[in-house]
């Protein structure tokens, strides 16, 4: 059973850094629960505001529903007493409901609702999709604005009026006008989090649009650096942010951009580099090439 009401959860999440932990796999690319629990325990030993299990960085797109439920349950059992654990819900409406209900049964605190799978929908369809999931669980729900689920400000407002359990808006598009419209219309009714790849890159400007937090993938392998960066952002310390961007984040982006799909692969590469391997990535993603891993390891050494 969730420890926080949806509104309490929003208050906890909006003023701290959010982590999307990788999902550990063994040599056969099967879920390695023991290693995953160790990774989460390490992640939770730092002051992070929330952990999103089986999300994008956690290769949720490659997990079966049963695997996803197992990953979420393991996360809740391992660290749920100290940090809120949220789960992803995606695919068809029926699948998203199944994911949400399984997460609630496992003791998760909230849901990140991913776009419907490969289905184009107008605003009315998106409203019904989100409403169906919100109505099927008592957990707080965060909608993910990206791909084929671009929620207009009026749509978000209608959903917020209909469902008190809708607590957050995550943006993975980066359309500044769109974000400004949503924040201007909804204000403090929701909390807002950045969800672009390597979200640190955009964190300072998006803070001005109400996005007080973001999903940090690099927190997986450089947690203290990620927390320090977040604190610099919240302090509006442009000098410190720009230094960290130039010294680490932008060189990291250069490695990430060498191969499509490296946004996830490079996170597991980072764990390999610090001796905390979480295994490889599942196809169609590719593991980092040896030279890319060597370059990443050298970069991490500059901030460790």
UniProtKB/Swiss-Prot annotation:
Q: Which InterPro entries match?
A: Aldolase_TIM, DapA-like, Dehydro-deoxyglucarate_dehyd
Please give the pathway this protein is involved in: Carbohydrate acid metabolism; D-glucarate degradation; 2,5-dioxopentanoate from D-glucarate: step 2/2
Q: What is its EC number?
A: 4.2.1.41
Q: Which terms in the Gene Ontology molecular function aspect does this entry carry?
A: 4-hydroxy-tetrahydrodipicolinate synthase activity; 5-dehydro-4-deoxyglucarate dehydratase activity
Q: Which reaction does it catalyse?
A: 5-dehydro-4-deoxy-D-glucarate + H(+) = 2,5-dioxopentanoate + CO2 + H2O
The answer to whether keyword Lyase applies is yes
GO BP, sorted A to Z: D-glucarate catabolic process
Alphabetic keyword roster: Lyase
Q: Which family does it belong to?
A: Belongs to the DapA family.
Which protein are we looking at? Probable 5-dehydro-4-deoxyglucarate dehydratase
Q: What organism is the protein native to? A: Arthrobacter sp. (strain FB24)
Q: What is the lineage of its organism?
A: Bacteria, Bacillati, Actinomycetota, Actinomycetes, Micrococcales
